[in-house]
Each structure stands twice: as C-alpha cells, then as structure tokens.
Amino acid sequence: MGIRAIVVDTAGTTTDLNFIEDVLFPYSAKALPAFLEENQNNVLVDNCICDVQDIALEPDASLARVTEILLQWIEEDRKATPLKTIQGLIWKQGYANGEFTGHIFPDFIEALDGYKQQGLRVYSFSSGSVEAQKLLFSHSDAGDLNDKFNGHFDTRTGNKRFKQAYSNIVNTISLSPKQILFVSDVLEELKAANEAGLHVVQMVRDDSQRTGDFKTIASFDELKID
C-alpha cells in the first residue's frame, strides 16, 4: 500500500519562516486596530470578537480590549482560531493591494508538478487559517498555485501537536494512515502524526533546527515517493 497523499506544513517547510515572522505578522499587527474598528459589524469579524472574549474569559471586553488581547496573541504566536481568521482577512487586503507576495521555496514549487504527475493528492496543514493558506499559495512569488492542491487544513481540524488532528485528516480525505505522508519542520507535529499512523519526514532547512529519529530532508528535491 503506497503513498497516495502528501500533507505539508507551511511555515518552515514550504514557506520561509522569515516571511511569516518579518512580513505577515507585523503587517497584521499594524493593520489590526483599524481593521477591527471598520469591520466590527461584519458577521465573521463579530463572531471572532465573541470568540476572543470567550477564550480570554472576558465576556464584556470592549473592542479596545479585544484588540489588545489579539495584539498580545500575535506577539506570542498564539494558535487561536479567531486570531488566525482575522489575520487571514487582513492579509487578504495586503495581497490584493500588492503590498507583498507569498514566499514559497522554489524546490516545493517544482515538486508540486511532480506530485501531480505521480497522481498524488496534495494538502497543506497550517495553524494559519484555510483562507490564509489559499491566499499564500494563490499570490505566491510563482503565481497562483492553488490548483495544485486538493485541499487545506487549519486549527479547526485540531491542534497540530495532537494525534487527533491527523486522525481527523485521515477521516476527511478517506485514506488509510499508511497512505499519507506528512512533512513538517516541527518535531512535535511529526510525533503526533506518527502516533496517528502517518508516514512522516522532517524538513530541516536550518542546521540549528531540533531533530529526532525521523527521516530528514533539506529540500523537497530529496523527497522520493514510490
């Protein structure tokens, strides 16, 4: 029973962490106060505001306080769904205005075509929202790559460091765990996916990166799927 689907992490795997940390995060932090003020009556944004109040256990938090909480979460790189949803909406404006394009490592761009030729399904799994992932890949340095993906997963699927998230992916794409390969740079994510029965490979693009006992590669050029 061979590999039929590959699931890739984004930050540090398909995309340079510096793009996330030095471009996307600061952009969302700077734009956040005005965005919330202008869009607080939007149903999706209003739902996110309510979710922030619930998570923070501050049901009566004002808009200014919610903004403060979200800015703190950005600073902490908190993987909270309402934050990731709002960031995705803010980044959508930035991409649309041409303020930046999505960084994708060239080796992954080249590999995508090969996966399609092999008949493999390709999915991404990120703590960033599905919307943010679609924006990243549709506004990439190499153009629109979204048609090369079969789907995307985010925190609504589960915490990337917990086994259940990967079991949920298995159920969603209707394959057995051993037919799925997960590639990530984060050891805890690989351990969780491995516990769920998936094949795993660690992407190590930086020599200072913490590694474990899993197979490692330095680029997608080195990933051979039979």
From Swiss-Prot:
GO MF entry, a single one: magnesium ion binding
Listed EC numbers: 3.1.3.77
GO BP, sorted A to Z: L-methionine salvage from methylthioadenosine
Free-text remark on how the cofactor is bound: Binds 1 Mg(2+) ion per subunit.
Enzyme class: hydrolase
Cofactor: Mg(2+)
Involved pathway(s): Amino-acid biosynthesis; L-methionine biosynthesis via salvage pathway; L-methionine from S-methyl-5-thio-alpha-D-ribose 1-phosphate: step 3/6; Amino-acid biosynthesis; L-methionine biosynthesis via salvage pathway; L-methionine from S-methyl-5-thio-alpha-D-ribose 1-phosphate: step 4/6
Keywords noted in UniProt: Amino-acid biosynthesis, Hydrolase, Magnesium, Metal-binding, Methionine biosynthesis
Reactions catalysed: 5-methylsulfanyl-2,3-dioxopentyl phosphate + H2O = 1,2-dihydroxy-5-(methylsulfanyl)pent-1-en-3-one + phosphate
Alphabetized InterPro entries for the sequence: Enolase-ppase_E1 (IPR023943), HAD-like_sf (IPR036412), HAD-SF_hydro_IA (IPR006439), HAD_sf (IPR023214)
Family: Belongs to the HAD-like hydrolase superfamily. MasA/MtnC family.
Complexes and interactors: Monomer.
Role according to the record: Bifunctional enzyme that catalyzes the enolization of 2,3-diketo-5-methylthiopentyl-1-phosphate (DK-MTP-1-P) into the intermediate 2-hydroxy-3-keto-5-methylthiopentenyl-1-phosphate (HK-MTPenyl-1-P), which is then dephosphorylated to form the acireductone 1,2-dihydroxy-3-keto-5-methylthiopentene (DHK-MTPene).
HAMAP family, alphabetized: Salvage_MtnC
UniProt name for this protein: Enolase-phosphatase E1
Organism: Shewanella pealeana (strain ATCC 700345 / ANG-SQ1)
Lineage, top ranks: Bacteria, Pseudomonadati, Pseudomonadota, Gammaproteobacteria, Alteromonadales
